[in-house]
């Protein structure tokens, strides 16, 4: 059985002029369920390691808006990931 372990296919996202590779296919699918803006914020925060203040400046939005959108996106990602786990 261990010889037939399926490997995830890395998926590339473009954000802030950079290519971000998400190695987990499940996470990538969950990210695709987010609005483009929320996905952008999550990728900038956790893959490009930008702070909320930096993201806010790039998007021309208040830091509080970025923080709210980030938290809402994380909650939505958690829900999507749980749905996928339940389907397995």
Where do the model's predicted regions map?
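DNA-recognition helix of helix-turn-helix
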Residues: 53, 59-84
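Internal acidic/polar
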Residues: 1-20, 24
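Flexible coil/turn residues that form the inter-helical turn or adjacent wing/linker of helix-turn-helix
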Residues: 48-49, 54
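Short helix-coil-helix linker/hinge
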Residues: 21, 31-38
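A short pre-motif secondary-structure segment
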Residues: 41-45
